[in-house]
Amino acid sequence: DLYISIVSFKSFKRGGGIELEILQQPGMIYSHATELLNQLERDDVWSQTCEIEDKTEFIQRADYFVKGILLENIILSETYKCYQTIDKKRFYVSQLSVGVQEGLSNSEADLIIVDREKKESYLFEIKHSDKVVDRQTRHLQNEDFINYVSENFAPVKKCCVIYNGQPTKIDSIDYLNAEKFLMTVH
């Protein structure tokens, strides 16, 4: 399949989920993005009129951003497919993004897994990085966000960062290696 549809709710209580369409061809997407960035680098008009001081750094950051989105999509879609085969009524797997409408500062989880049977939820940030950085956990340490998830989905049992580094634990946050995580959902 070219893409997978995943329903995303802001709350189980209120319903009204939206469909997330996750493209299933990360290699194709990355190839297109890389070609567009290469064309941008070679574009004389862009080079002469763009007010970005360090264009090489801009291109590198754009590439890094694309890789981050692709990693999020891969982990979300593979985790979703895994839990759908286990028990699609028991497990809810999606993304979560809330904000002012929910009475919160903008907060998100790149991956939320809710076990409806055990009445517990797990929140994940997904980062295309091999470094542990405090900023990676800002949503996972936001007490208002954790309370919101606990009230609107199920009590939060664990918060984790999935990244490209070695597994470790800092305070209450587990850092999981992305490759190892993906191997567990296959």
Question: Which residues does each predicted region cover?
Answer:
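A structural signal for short secondary-structure junctions
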Residues: 103-107, 115-119, 151-155
